[in-house]
């Protein structure tokens, strides 16, 4: 099953610093050994509870659960992971992630986020990870489009609501500022997430208009992988999903 995913999203496309693939793998894995699959953005205690409830022994996430070759260091930095990891071992549940190898696909994360907000448009590739919607649009119009499907916080460095742009550039997740700057123009509105103060300064100094939305929009990954798996395994393997509701709220 994971070989099927790697045919579409090759591990070779994973960044050198990334930890795509298995964070924990049970020694056996044939198709007949699968009791169920849960697809989520991240592995948390809630996702593990969902897997136990569904009697699933494979969890597929976008973000890798383990980001370190040294488990002791990983658990020291993120203590909550040790308890989850020990449960995975005890219950024989494998965890597999598709991260930058999924992002790098022509229809990767940025493509699907762009498609979510502009369903009638065809996103064009922008660098390795970005997607561009070519359209004339004002900042106020973009806000209205985002609000139709997104209720989280929206931040921008441009107060000119009526200023006209010729495209919307999506860099899903924590977009890399030098890459964003390289592949965009002053006439693009840039949409990304988790923008650091230094990135706001960098892009503002380069006269770029930035719009910051929640990283949680990457949950579109779940929909894509769920569709792929249920199309392939129409019978025999139960595929479930886990979405966070209101993980981050305004005070």
Curated annotation (Swiss-Prot):
GO terms for molecular function: metal ion binding. GO terms for cellular component: cytoplasm. Coiled coil: none annotated. Keywords: Metal-binding. A divalent metal cation 2 binds at residues 63, 215, 219. A divalent metal cation 1 binds at residues 62, 103, 219. InterPro entries: DUF34/NIF3 (IPR002678), DUF34/NIF3_sf (IPR036069). Pfam families: DUF34_NIF3 (PF01784). It comes from the Bacteria. Homohexamer. Belongs to the GTP cyclohydrolase I type 2/NIF3 family. This is GTP cyclohydrolase 1 type 2 homolog. It comes from Mycoplasmopsis pulmonis (strain UAB CTIP) (Mycoplasma pulmonis).
């Amino acid at each position: 099953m994971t070989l099927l995913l790697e045919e579409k999203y090759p591990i070779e496309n994973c960044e050198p610093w990334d930890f795509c693939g298995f964070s924990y793998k049970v020694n056996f894995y044939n198709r007949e050994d699968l009791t169920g699959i849960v697809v989520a953005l991240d592995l948390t205690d809630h996702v593990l509870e969902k897997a136990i409830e569904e009697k699933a022994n494979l969890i597929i996430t976008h973000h890798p659960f383990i980001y370190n070759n040294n488990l002791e260091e990983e658990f020291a930095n993120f203590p909550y992971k040790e308890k989850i990891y020990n449960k995975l071992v005890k219950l024989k549940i494998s965890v597999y992630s598709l991260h930058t190898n999924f992002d790098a696909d022509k229809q990767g994360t940025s493509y699907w986020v762009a498609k979510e907000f502009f369903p009638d448009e065809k996103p064009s590739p922008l660098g390795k990870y970005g997607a561009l919607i070519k359209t004339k649009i004002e900042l106020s119009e973009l806000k209205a489009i985002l609000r139709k499907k997104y209720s989280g916080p929206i931040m921008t460095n441009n107060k000119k609501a009526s200023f006209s742009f010729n495209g919307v550039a999506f860099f899903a997740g924590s977009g890399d500022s030098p890459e964003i700057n390289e592949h965009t123009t002053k006439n693009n509105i840039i949409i990304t997430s988790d923008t650091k103060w230094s990135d706001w300064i960098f892009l503002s100094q380069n006269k770029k208009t930035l719009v910051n939305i929640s990283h949680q929009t990457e949950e579109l990954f779940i929909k894509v992988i769920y569709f792929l798996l249920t199309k392939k395994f129409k019978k025999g393997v139960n595929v479930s999903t886990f979405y966070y509701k209101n993980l981050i709220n305004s005070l």
